[in-house]
Amino acid sequence: YYKNRPEGYDQLLSSGRVVIKDDVHIGALCTIDKGVTGDTTIDVGTKLDNQVQIAHDTVIGKKCLLASQVAVAGCVIIEDEVILWGQVGIKSDITIHKGVEVDAQSGVGFDLEEGKKYFGSPCIEARQKMRELSMMRILPDIVQKLRK
């Protein structure tokens, strides 16, 4: 949204719009930036909880659910039926494919494959992350046994 120049940051001129289709719910204190080079679009049936940030030129598909405090950077494509739980952060210029679910407080920095569930920061497939977390719980016991 800003160009870094030697004399400081220069705000880019916006020529886009915000397009909100039918049956979209936008909760309290949401921020939706208009597009810089194209439109920011929220498609039919999508629901935004309170305090959601949608940056410029982002396209959100049909029947998506974004829980409270989700932040989406610019130029992101979120395909249909995606669920982003609370406080998920999404890096710019990526695609979240159809049917993806991202658990709360996850950080998304790359494209996510269709129909999978993700968790963590950086996020990975949720089952793998849960395995890692369960192994971390027993790690102190393993280290103690190795020291004996």
Labelled PLM ranges:
Residues 123-148:
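Long, leucine- and charge-enriched amphipathic alpha-helices
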